[in-house]
């Protein structure tokens, strides 16, 4: 955020009173609002940065996990939890993991009751497919557009319950004294009006921070760390920020070709591999046989991503800096039925997946870290909740595919239950906070608008994303991380003097994003430097082994004089049932796909 001194002239702003303010209109925010409405809380407002139903949830393709046992009746929530902990390299919060896995069979059936368009077996049951590093087929899906189907279902349910939404509003700051939250400040992206929301409870369901990298699966104006930065600025702690998931299969394209360039890094769903897709290097070798002969293409995402990065780095990459993903051994009808959106996307670009492979390379996809919360999704700031990708704790050092959508609906319910039990009417921002926090912040925003600074916003963001890819990417070491922090400081200086348009302009939105991204980027770099081991998605070439003494979570707190301080805490132990599942050591039978 621009720190230049504003004038003292008062800033006009609207005020809106609400008992519960939900920031984020994706699956997590929608499900929390539904739970509140079903429990009789009608004074709720859901805010979205885009039009109704247009959230990042719709970009989640492959599926949503739950131990239904459609094909594998021996599956269970305890085994699902064990797989999640193993994939997270045992630094997940076991309580949060079990909260999600225990709920998911019921949540999947509930979505079915609400009309979700699941893909189905021949006898009409909810179909489930393989996803990487899972012991059984537990990923329910709607073709390869599961997130879109999920959000449509939740939006329809919310509308049936008359849940109020407000579109095209961006929150820029929480109103917090560090002990409790009292509301939030933002602006209407259509007309430029500043708004103070007096809220008794605030729920951050604002996504993650994967777009702080220059190759990412998000749209450029989302997943820029809004939720984490807002919470951190409001006095909440962050956790596990060093763990960034690089999805193995983002599109690798000719970036000089205007038709292909916008697709660089965009997700090629894991469902392609779950349905039998195979990875080959430029020499025609199915290289996962060298890295993971048992699980092959369906090993953990961090394993597959590092394998692809190594193939590219050692000169066995394809023309556009990737490897080949090939599902052409499947019939065209099968691909069109099971992967309709992927098939259509590549058809539109002139590639027939049924006839030829596509080029893929790792891409930033998901931040396992986020805001530290308790078992109900509440932060250490009273009445401030964080759910979905904004929260930390469920995924540990690496995330199972299909668990992100599961987390959104499970913790939407959990947070909604807790809030409904104690909601106490609209908030009221104390006069002192309004004078010391709200009004100075609004003057800062006004001063940032129409500023004729020296640096273009797009150039500042591009530099930030480039340095994160170079210094905090798939492979890390101390020297590079320290250089990344130095470069980040220089970017921060440039961000203080940007050329910004009016409040309704895209450049103003992105300038606000820049402030959020700087917080998230610093936490990722500092956490990666602090964790002197390799674990899951965090790989240090100068500390390549996993250290049992580092089975701890890194927390990030705001320092009294600015910046952040780091501390570590040990991880809790799982329940007896989940520990038994861990001890049994269930393992995917990959060869069922051959």
Model-derived regions: residue spans:
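Glycine-rich loop(s) and the adjacent beta-strand/alpha-helix scaffold that form part
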Residues: 201-257, 298, 317, 398, ...
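N-terminal Rossmann-like FAD-binding beta1-loop-alpha1 element of flavoenzymes
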Residues: 20-46
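Conserved redox-cofactor binding core of oxidoreductases
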Residues: 107, 113-193, 198, 247-259
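FAD-site-proximal beta/loop scaffold in flavoenzymes
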Residues: 173-190, 194-196, 351-390
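Glycine- and aromatic-enriched mobile tails/lids
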Residues: 2-18, 32-35, 51-53, 58-60, ...
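An anion/pyrophosphate-binding glycine-rich loop and adjacent beta-alpha core
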Residues: 230, 236-352, 418, 422-424
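Short hydrophobic core segments
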Residues: 21-23, 197-206
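Conserved N-terminal glycine-rich FAD pyrophosphate-binding loop of Rossmann-like flavoproteins
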Residues: 50-85, 89, 249, 258-263
């Amino acid at each position: 955020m621009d720190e230049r001194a504003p004038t003292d002239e008062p800033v006009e702003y609207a005020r809106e009173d609400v008992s519960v303010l939900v920031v984020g209109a994706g699956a997590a925010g929608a499900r929390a609002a539904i739970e509140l409405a079903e429990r009789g809380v009608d004074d709720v407002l859901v805010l979205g940065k885009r039009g109704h139903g247009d959230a990042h949830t719709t970009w989640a393709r492959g599926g949503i996990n739950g131990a239904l046992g459609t094909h594998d009746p021996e599956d269970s929530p305890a085994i699902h939890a064990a797989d999640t902990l193993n994939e997270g390299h045992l630094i997940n919060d076991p309580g949060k993991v079990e909260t999600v896995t225990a709920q998911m069979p019921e949540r999947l059936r509930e979505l079915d009751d609400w009309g979700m368009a699941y893909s189905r077996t021949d006898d009409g049951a909810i179909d489930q497919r393989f996803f990487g590093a899972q012991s059984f087929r537990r990923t329910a899906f709607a073709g390869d557009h599961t997130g879109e189907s999920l959000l449509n279902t939740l939006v329809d349910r919310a509308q049936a319950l008359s849940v109020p939404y407000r579109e095209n509003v961006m929150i820029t700051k929480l109103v917090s004294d560090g002990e409790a939250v009292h509301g939030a400040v933002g602006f209407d992206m259509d007309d430029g009006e500043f708004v103070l929301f007096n809220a008794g409870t605030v729920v951050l369901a604002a996504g993650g921070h994967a777009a702080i990298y220059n190759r990412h699966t998000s749209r450029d104006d989302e997943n820029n760390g809004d939720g984490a930065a807002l919470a951190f600025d409001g006095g909440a702690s962050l956790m596990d920020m060093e763990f960034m998931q690089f999805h193995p299969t983002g599109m690798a394209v000719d970036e000089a070709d205007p038709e292909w360039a916008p697709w660089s890094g965009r997700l090629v769903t894991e469902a392609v591999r779950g349905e039998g897709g195979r990875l080959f290097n430029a020499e025609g070798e199915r290289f996962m046989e060298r890295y993971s002969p048992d699980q092959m293409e369906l090993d953990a995402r961090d394993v597959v991503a590092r394998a692809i990065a190594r193939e590219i780095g050692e000169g066995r990459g394809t023309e556009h800096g990737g490897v080949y993903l090939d599902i052409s051994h499947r019939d065209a009808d099968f691909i069109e039925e099971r992967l309709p959106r992927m098939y259509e996307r590549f058809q539109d670009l002139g590639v027939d997946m049924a006839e030829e492979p596509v080029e893929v390379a790792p891409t930033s996809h998901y931040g396992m870290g986020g805001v530290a919360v308790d078992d109900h999704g509440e932060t250490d700031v009273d009445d401030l909740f964080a759910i979905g990708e904004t929260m930390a704790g469920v995924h540990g050092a690496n995330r199972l595919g299909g668990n992100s959508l599961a987390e959104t609906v499970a913790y939407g319910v959990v947070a909604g239950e807790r809030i409904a039990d104690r909601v106490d009417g609209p908030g009221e921002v104390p006069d002192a906070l309004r004078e010391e926090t709200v009004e100075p912040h609004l003057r800062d925003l006004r001063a940032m608008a129409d500023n004729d600074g020296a640096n273009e916003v797009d150039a500042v963001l591009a530099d930030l994303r480039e340095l994160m890819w170079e210094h905090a990417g798939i492979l890390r070491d101390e020297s590079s991380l320290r250089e990344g922090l130095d470069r980040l400081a220089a970017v921060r200086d440039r961000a203080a003097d940007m050329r910004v348009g009016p409040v309704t302009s895209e450049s103003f939105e992105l300038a606000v994003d820049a402030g959020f991204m700087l917080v998230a980027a610093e936490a990722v770099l500092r956490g990666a430097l602090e964790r002197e081991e390799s674990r899951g998605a965090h790989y240090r070439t100068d500390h390549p082994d996993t250290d049992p003494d580092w089975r701890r979570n890194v927390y990030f707190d705001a320092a009294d004089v600015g910046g952040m301080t780091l501390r570590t805490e040990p991880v809790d132990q799982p329940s007896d049932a989940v520990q038994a599942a861990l001890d049994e050591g269930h393992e995917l039978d990959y060869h069922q796909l051959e």
